């Protein structure tokens, strides 16, 4: 009997414990009902519970991110790449002054400039009125592949500030015009001036590149008048100040016109500096009885007082008969070859220096459609064989080295362009 009561007592305790557990489990909170789209959809897994639809899922903000919204880099667009504006096309500017019978000589010089150059060139031709139509006729018949590389403008001979007749008679007719280029070409920044009796034997681009070598004070570049002071003209005969030990030759003159216009120049007339325009006429008045080579002498005087403003380039950029008629005395030409030939003393038109005349004739007679080697280089070699009896003709390697390089360069460039156009 006592055992039965113990049994029933234990059974009641167990039953009561189960009832308590059942009530506790029955009070577990149920998940809230999902959205309508989810309520009507079948269970996604066999496990009982609730899953938010993927398209409605909003990730929690991580507390460590300071409440900032996380960037979804997959949806970020790269900024639109705008094409760079095209670089303005660089033009080289070449100036020449032609008077009297210099038409043919000038056109031959212009032909040599455009023939071997890469960038486009603007010709600034200062000429007497009687030559204007002749220049136009000569330049307009150039073939299209040449004419599209150039622009030209013909200007009248002009000397600002009056004294026209006085300036016009200085040295050679119209030669003093070059002194006034900074004032006459106000919209031109830089310029290469050459005499009419100059021939380019390599791209004008190469001498144009000297502009980048100018330091902060330099505004012009010229070559020495001579390499040896003992036989130089200025060192022996000049009665006025001149640059350096041998002076400079102005037949090839590279100028930063902007700097020239803005600079004040030291002088021996007044303590203060003078602008280029203010200085020219007083300087001429002071030295006109002592100068022989006109405007070139005035330039030598200017750079004597302002040597820091001049860049001096090697003699092969202005190679003249003086460099070979007394023996070879331009070491740079022996190494590099002649880059710019300057046939002063009228050597293109007489028999005194046939080596110079040979270049002039083959470039003058060359037609743009001909083969460079067949129509220019080979005839040039033949003409040099006829000049070996002269001092200049005895050094053909000096004359021919650079133009041979130039022709090979032009040939290779044309071949590459032709191949690319076919591809």
UniProtKB/Swiss-Prot annotation:
Molecular function terms, GO-annotated: UDP-D-xylose:beta-D-glucoside alpha-1,3-D-xylosyltransferase activity; UDP-xylosyltransferase activity
A Pfam family that the UniProt record links to this protein: Glyco_transf_8
Stretches for region Disordered: 60-85
Cell compartment(s), UniProt: Membrane
InterPro entries with a match to the protein in the record: Glyco_trans_8 (IPR002495), Glycosyltransferase_8 (IPR051993), Nucleotide-diphossugar_trans (IPR029044)
Membrane-topology descriptor: Single-pass type II membrane protein
TM segment ranges: 7-26
Positions on the Lumenal side per record topology: 27-423
Ranges in the topological domain labelled Cytoplasmic: 1-6
CC annotations in GO: membrane
Keywords in alphabetical order: Glycoprotein, Glycosyltransferase, Membrane, Signal-anchor, Transferase, Transmembrane, Transmembrane helix
EC number per UniProt: 2.4.2.42
GO biological processes: O-glycan processing
EC top class named in words: transferase
Catalytic activity: 3-O-(beta-D-glucosyl)-L-seryl-[EGF-like domain protein] + UDP-alpha-D-xylose = 3-O-[alpha-D-xylosyl-(1->3)-beta-D-glucosyl]-L-seryl-[EGF-like domain protein] + UDP + H(+)
Top-rank taxon, per record: Eukaryota
Predominant location: membrane
Function: Glycosyltransferase which elongates the O-linked glucose attached to EGF-like repeats in the extracellular domain of Notch proteins by catalyzing the addition of xylose.
Entry's family note: Belongs to the glycosyltransferase 8 family.
PANTHER family to which the protein is assigned, alphabetical: GLUCOSIDE XYLOSYLTRANSFERASE 2, IP22168P
Annotated protein name in UniProt: Glucoside xylosyltransferase 2
